[in-house]
């Protein structure tokens, strides 16, 4: 509450880096980035896996806290903060409802892993990671190593959302807009060819200075 009621944070984050619900759906965003734009999506409620089918997990949307959804940096902060509390609640529920017995159900994990390594076939895995849906595809051909393994991390699904978020915004707002989707750049390692007529480079110090200057202007 102390963070969410801070006037300076509201001034810097409200109506900045807006991602509409329509754009969020068109760009196939996932996780808190999608939910902050009003998209009611969460694999734990939509396609429950593991124990989630027995737990009370529902997608957190900004209007549950603020009574409205703007899809801005502030809403993305709200969703992430509320999801911290939700995670604590899930842990408490798991502890209170966990059945008695051994922690690991499979007594011979090494044997199980050996069988899995020699498996044949293909499968997919989908989980709701902190940044959204993480998708894995694996193809096994009876050898110890997978024949094919492809991963689509949640940050990769959210990168395109920067386009509408950043369009028309001030340079001073770039750091908070980029950070608002909590990007894991190592999860999005790809090759890209970029062609441009000219370019300029802003250092970390330049971005920090511009951000501080804008905050001070708003406080005047």
Question: Regions from the language model: what does each represent?
Answer:
Residues 1-220:
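Active-site bordering "gate/hinge" segments
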């Amino acid at each position: 509450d102390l963070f969410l009621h801070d006037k300076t944070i509201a001034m810097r984050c409200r109506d900045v880096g807006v991602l509409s619900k329509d754009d969020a759906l068109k760009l196939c965003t996932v996780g808190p980035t999608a939910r902050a734009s009003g998209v009611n999506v969460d694999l734990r409620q939509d396609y429950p896996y593991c124990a989630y089918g027995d737990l009370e997990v529902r997608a957190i949307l900004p209007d549950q806290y603020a009574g409205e959804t703007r899809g801005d940096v502030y809403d993305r902060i709200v969703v992430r903060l509320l999801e911290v509390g939700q995670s604590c609640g899930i842990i408490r529920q798991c502890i209170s409802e966990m059945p008695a017995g051994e922690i690991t159900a499979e007594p011979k994990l090494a044997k199980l892993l050996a069988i899995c390594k020699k498996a044949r076939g293909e499968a997919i895995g989908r989980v709701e990671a902190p940044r959204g849906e993480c998708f894995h595809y694996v193809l096994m051909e009876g050898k110890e190593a997978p024949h094919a393994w492809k991963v689509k991390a949640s940050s990769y699904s959210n990168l395109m959302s920067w386009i509408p978020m950043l369009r028309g915004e001030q340079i001073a707002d770039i750091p908070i807009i980029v950070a608002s989707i909590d990007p894991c750049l190592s999860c999005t390692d790809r090759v890209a060819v970029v062609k441009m007529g000219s370019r300029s480079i802003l250092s970390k110090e330049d971005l920090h200075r511009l951000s501080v200057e804008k905050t001070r202007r708003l406080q005047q």
